[in-house]
Amino acid sequence: MEPAKMAPIKNAPRDALVMAQILKDMGITEYEPRVINQMLEFAFRYVTTILDDAKIYSSHAKKPTVDADDVRLAIQCRADQSFTSPPPRDFLLDIARQKNQTPLPLIKPYAGPRLPPDRYCLTAPNYRLKSLVKKGPNQGRLVPRLSAVSSRPTTPPVAPPQAVSGPNKAATPVSVTSQRFAVQIPPSQSTPAKPAPAATAVQNVLINPSMIGPKNILITTSMVSSQNTATDSNPLKRKHDDDDDNDTM
């Protein structure tokens, strides 16, 4: 450092000159000018703390003024806290010997950094986050939401029943109940005018309720059995066969 920085200023305060002289007497010749200010702040803080402690001790002993014994007691108590010397070497060796007798924890057998368990390291968090959101009774459950459109398949619209007029048999009106629909279909119009008394076959058709709704629909169809149709067509066939035989003769 330059000598101009180490030399105290002549017009400096008296406390600064005294601190510079103390540093010179201790053999400290190289320092920055700000060191004197730091030393003055430390000295002021230390002296005021010692005097405050001495005043407390004097009032506790019920003395009218602070004497030298109170100051010595304050310095002795403050020295144990502020100015501590390192422990002796023998004491440190004894503590190190006792500490080294404790075996180290086993290392986990896995790939990666060979570290002791997490409780002996500072790598794992030692806290747990608490959620502020309170879970309700129904939270976390999946509640199915069904719509009227997706719950049942679409069905084509049913045309209103109409009365069909036949040459032989009049169509019976359609009877509609609350839950069942009875529909009777008359025999086909292609049959000849000559009615043939034959037993009618009844066929019941039950539609799956899941396709239409909660109501069941029963459709009753009255139809002429296939045997009656066969008996009606057989005379015509026989007549044609007889005509063919006459022509050949």
Curated annotation (Swiss-Prot):
It is found in: Nucleus. One of its GO terms (cellular component) is transcription factor TFTC complex. The modification Phosphothreonine is found at T172. Residues 148-171, 224-249 are annotated as: Disordered. Gene3D superfamilies: Histone, subunit A (1.10.20.10). Its main location: nucleus. Residues 224-234 have a biased composition (Polar residues). Transmembrane segments: none annotated. It holds the Pfam family TFIID-31kDa. The keyword Acetylation applies. The modification Phosphoserine is found at S147, S175. The keyword Transcription regulation applies. GO terms for biological process: DNA-templated transcription initiation; negative regulation of apoptotic process; negative regulation of transcription by RNA polymerase II; positive regulation of cell growth; protein stabilization. PANTHER family: TAF9 RNA POLYMERASE II, TATA BOX-BINDING PROTEIN (TBP)-ASSOCIATED FACTOR, TRANSCRIPTION INITIATION FACTOR TFIID SUBUNIT 9B. Belongs to the TAF9 family. Binds TAF5 and TAF6. Component of TFIID and the TATA-binding protein-free TAF complex (TFTC). TFIID is composed of TATA binding protein (TBP) and a number of TBP-associated factors (TAFs). Binds N-terminal domain of p53/TP53 which is essential for transcription. This is Transcription initiation factor TFIID subunit 9B. It comes from Mus musculus. The lineage of its organism: Eukaryota, Metazoa, Chordata, Craniata, Vertebrata.
